Amino acid sequence: MNNILKNDWNNYIGNEFEKDYYLKLRKNLAQEYKTKTIYPDMYNIFNALHYTAFDDVKVVILGQDPYHGPNQAHGLSFSVNPGVRTPPSLLNIYKELKDDIGCYIPNNGYLKKWADQGVLLLNTVLTVRAGEANSHKNIGWQIFTDNIIKVLNTREKPIVFILWGNNAIRKEELITNPKHHIIKSVHPSPLSASRGFFGSKPFSKTNEFLKNDNEIPIDWQIENL
């Protein structure tokens, strides 16, 4: 069980996989994957952790749960697989990115470039039933992802936490280390973006924090594929 995570995350949260809540979650998930269509593919569930090692995390962008349409989710919050239409929330993120720091709006929603630079794209719930948003919110994932946030909170090297929407902002209480930075606003969803997401400048603010902490800023431009 302890070999699920292949990088340094294993040292920090590897023991979660042995805990009762996780064993119950795993059993539940095995049944769900067997009998229903679940996203993402089971081999992609932990991609956020695989792509961004614990020691490499500079920024955390918290999402809610995976996209629930075909071929969209691949384990990174807000990101979709190449070749899939950019979802509305991500399109709004791109619009803010353009207004904030001048990035052009790309023809895809594949955010692995961010993950490779130290942006942990973490959903608070890591799986979902096809077509049923939030269908896995009560099966134990929140315990697991809360513990990820708690262990990041203990880190000496500062992290920028980007919290969009009430679901993410509720996690602010887990971030108690004064070394870290918190940027928060309403969610980029079309339902709320015009009430304070547009114009919030999270990307330039993040890079300002990173520069002040002597870290290399993030190159936020996602290129056309």
Swiss-Prot record:
CDD domains: UDG-F1-like
Species lineage: Bacteria, Bacillati, Bacillota, Clostridia, Eubacteriales
Xref: Gene3D superfamilies: Uracil-DNA glycosylase-like domain
Stretches that traverse the bilayer: none
Record key words, sorted: Cytoplasm, DNA damage, DNA repair, Hydrolase
EC number: 3.2.2.27
GO molecular function ontology, one term from the record: uracil DNA N-glycosylase activity
Catalytic activity from the UniProt record: Hydrolyzes single-stranded DNA or mismatched double-stranded DNA and polynucleotides, releasing free uracil
GO biological process entries: base-excision repair, AP site formation via deaminated base removal
Location within or outside the cell: Cytoplasm
Encoding gene (name): ung
Protein's name according to its UniProt entry: Uracil-DNA glycosylase
Active-site positions on this chain: D65
InterPro entries: UDG_fam1, Ura-DNA_Glyclase_AS, Uracil-DNA_glycosylase-like, Uracil-DNA_glycosylase-like_sf
Entries under PROSITE patterns matching the protein: U_DNA_GLYCOSYLASE
Any Gene Ontology CC annotation: cytoplasm
Family named by the database record: Belongs to the uracil-DNA glycosylase (UDG) superfamily. UNG family.
